[in-house]
């Protein structure tokens, strides 16, 4: 399941970074843009109430590390997109997230997202460093690893 939060959500910190992300990601319809995403692995027996959705979430926040942790999402603050996948695809995406847990934040890629010269998550590997991501990059890469998205989809 894909999870998104809008820039005007009460769960976000009031910071220059979130304001900048919101201004760069503005929507043509005037609604607050989505500025954060997470990939939620919901087991069939997952607990989905009328107010929350829970499972294992994979993402990263600014200056943080890729996480894969149990999380509960409020339906009031988050927007969800369900998707179907096979057990093999689910396992492949889960393994991808486990393999990248602890990777750092892609600061240069985040601030140069508009540039054709921005570093990709794996650009750092040739320097002997682990991959670096921002939230949409790790979510898209996980979906690509499970063949939910194909390689024609941009990485962010």
Q: Where do the PLM segments sit?
A:
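Glycine-rich catalytic cores of cysteine/serine-nucleophile enzymes that process amide/ester linkages
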Residues: 3-87, 122-127
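A structural motif
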Residues: 84-119
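Short alpha-helical interface patches
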Residues: 68-81, 89-96, 146, 150-152, ...
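Activation targets extended, charge/polar-rich intrinsically disordered C-terminal tails
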Residues: 117-156
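Substrate-binding/catalytic groove segments of enzymes
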Residues: 48, 103-108, 145-153
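Short alpha-helical scaffold segments that flank and stabilize functional sites
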Residues: 6, 41, 100, 142-145
């Amino acid at each position: 399941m894909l999870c998104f939060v809008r820039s005007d959500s009460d769960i976000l910190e009031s910071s220059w970074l979130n304001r900048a992300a919101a201004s760069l990601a503005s929507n043509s319809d005037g609604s607050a843009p989505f500025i954060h995403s997470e990939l939620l692995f919901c087991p069939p027996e997952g607990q989905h109430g009328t107010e929350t959705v829970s499972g294992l979430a994979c993402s990263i926040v600014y200056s943080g590390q890729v996480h894969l942790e149990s999380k509960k999402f409020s339906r009031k603050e988050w927007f969800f997109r369900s998707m179907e996948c096979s057990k093999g695809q689910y396992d492949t995406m889960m393994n991808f997230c486990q393999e990248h847990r602890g990777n750092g934040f892609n600061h240069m890629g985040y601030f140069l997202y508009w540039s054709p010269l921005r570093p990709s998550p794996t650009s750092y590997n040739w320097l002997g460093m682990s991959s670096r991501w921002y939230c949409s990059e790790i979510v898209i890469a996980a979906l690509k690893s499970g063949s939910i998205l194909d390689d024609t989809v941009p990485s962010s």
